[in-house]
Amino acid sequence: MSQLGSAVPSSNLPEGLPVSSLALLILVLIPCVLLLLLLNCLFVGYKLFRMTRRKRDRYGSEMSLMHSSYSTRQRITRFSDEPPVAPNRKTNYVSVSEPMLAPPITSSLTSSAERRATGQRAMFLRPDGATYAGSESLRVPHWRTSAPVLVQSSDSDMERVNTVPPNSPVLRVTPNGFSVPMTSLRRSSTMELESTSLDKIHVECESASIIPQENSCYVVSSSSSARGSGLDSDFGASAGVSLRILSMDSDGFPGSAWASALEWDYYDPSYVTQNHVPKHRPQAPPITTKQYWV
């Protein structure tokens, strides 16, 4: 019996060891879980803080844009002294040359006198040049007071102001009432025409403001120095575009001193290749060798 009693506690000893190791494992895992929860809470709080800060920055930028648009709208607002129902309404305009900035909001150090002085520095101008405050010393000169007046049409061409932009081509008015754009043409001493009316040909002329008006005919040449319509003969031949050129083929030119007239022909770039016309090539210079003593 004594041996059985001594064997029972020996069998209970190894069963207590796993219980203690499990408790130790639980005691170690609990702080780890709590630490993970704390880190998760900190991460979520940081994300919320970033979101609120981003929203605040966006709201501040929107407010600054609204404030700038409001100040711009305020610069062009008209201030009226009398109600709009009054018959003689006096309207004052704001000068838009400089932006209107609100006076800085400070503490009680800014007195009412300083605010009044700041308000007097802002000068309101009307379109006629007079100041809003009525100061006679700062009045705009007389030549600046009048607003730009539209030029009325007059009978004489000398009094009429040219309202065409400076870079636009000059328009020539025909007897029928149509305006034809005039281009700058290259003049030649051998191409002067008589100042008679032409019936079957359209001659483009140029007129200068300094020299008297002359009639000059424009002939398209194959050289690149001539200023044409932007399409020279070489490019037309390579691109397969039929060019409209001036030639002297017809006879009988009424109203002119020339024996032959000018008429429009169409240049066919495939004529040379189809008819096997030989091209005139200049002879190459002879090659000579020279000996130099060094």
Swiss-Prot record:
Chain residue ranges for the region called Disordered: 154-175
Sequence motif SLRRSST motif, location on chain: 184-190
Main location: membrane
Membrane topology reported for the UniProt record: Single-pass membrane protein
Localization (cell): Cell membrane
Keyword annotations of the record: Cell membrane, Developmental protein, Membrane, Transmembrane, Transmembrane helix
Coiled coil regions in record: none
Disruption phenotype: Maternal mutant embryos lack the body axis: embryos develop normally during cleavage and blastula stages but lack the embryonic shield at the shield stage. The dorsal organizer is absent and embryos fail to form the head and other dorsoanterior tissues.
Bilayer-crossing regions: 24-44
This protein's GO CC annotations: plasma membrane
Cytoplasmic face residues: 45-294
Superkingdom assignment: Eukaryota
GO biological process, one term: embryonic axis specification
Extracellular side: 1-23
Cystine pairs: none
Motif (VPPNSP motif): 164-169
Note: Was named huluwa after the Chinese animation TV series huluwa, known as Calabash Brothers in western countries.
Function: Key maternal determinant of the dorsal organizer and body axis formation in vertebrates that acts by promoting stabilization of beta-catenin (ctnnb1). Localizes on the plasma membrane of the future dorsal blastomeres in early blastulas and binds to and promotes the tankyrase-mediated degradation of axin (axin1 and axin2). Axin degradation results in stabilization and nuclear translocation of beta-catenin (ctnnb1) for activating organizer-specific target gene expression.
Family: Belongs to the huluwa family.
Name of this protein: Protein huluwa
Lineage: Eukaryota, Metazoa, Chordata, Craniata, Vertebrata
